[in-house]
Amino acid sequence: MVLSDEAHSMGFYGPNGRGVYEAQGCEGDVDFIVGTFSKSVGTVGGFCVSNHPKFEAIRLACRPYIFTASLPPSVVATATASIRKLMTAHEKRERLWSNARTVHSGLREMGFKLGTETAESAIIAVILTDQTQAVMMWQALLENGLYVNMARPPATPAGTFLLRCSLCAEHTPEQVERILA
């Protein structure tokens, strides 16, 4: 069985924004697709979709699924509308890739250690090894109107601190340049 986790790639990868499995052309090889509505879809909740015969068994054994409530109809309607828009948002997808490449290469040129060698996502992780430096940089960015998420142990390996820069297609070229200023 093959499961594809598209939490960070939905809306970003593939001709229709379905994710890495679509970009790699292996739709027929994937048995289960999981993802979240809280990132590119802009709502809450998540999903697991499948036509696999074992899908029902997963539904019966998956503790987070068993002990949760269904999403409200308004959230489902909003997520559905957002996904439909993502499927045809080719220009936005290209703009998002452009923004990610610009910020990634700019941060690398400034000497920051990043989580990947090239832009592979709309989330760019700046890796730091000093907690005080990470907190000070995070606070300075906030004070200057730039919001980034900071991740630290236990969410990261011991001694590793991340400033996670999340980009979107709506960032203008001027805003992208400000990120790098």
Language model region names:
Residues D5, G46, A79, L96, ...:
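Residue-level signature of catalytic and energy-coupling elements of molecular machines
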